[in-house]
């Protein structure tokens, strides 16, 4: 990985994923936001007690750093499952500007350009999947339960079912 430079919000980038040319990606740090106190500064959680407007501003800054639309984020609803959801243009903004109409989702997959798949981590593992052949992507959250439950395999299986993805073609 490498740390992006010259932006308000520092992001870790993964060159292997960038080289595919079909995905913008970034892994946030705690830097570059407006949250204060124990949430300082780049808090991206609406569920931990931070000021909602501060979290929204943090997402605006993140969207700017990624050069994506703020209302295109799509959030998981992580509960340490192996559930994967295909998201479409109708899901844009769910979790940030619209209510989610789903629960218990630890992985997201899409072939819809412009959507920003968003997963969250503390001590769990981020899983990134890029299928350059079918121009599809996936992101999954895998804690110990997801790892034991084979979250990576569940995500690949969902991508194969929905997009025809073959594991041999994936950049992870």
Question: Which residues fall in each region the model found?
Answer:
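Surface-exposed, charge/polar-rich loops and edge strands
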Residues: 3, 24, 114-116, 124, ...
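Sequence-level motif detector for i,i+2 pairs with an aromatic at +2
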Residues: 6, 20-25, 39, 71, ...
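Short clusters of hydrophobic/aromatic residues that line enzyme substrate/ligand-binding pockets
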Residues: 11, 44, 109
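A general structural signal for short secondary-structure junctions and capping/turn motifs
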Residues: 15-19, 64-67, 164
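Intrinsically disordered, low-complexity, positively charged segments
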Residues: 16, 20-61
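Short acidic/glycine-rich loop or secondary-structure boundary segments that cap or lie
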Residues: 36, 83-85, 146-149
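Phosphate-centric recognition/catalysis
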Residues: 52-142
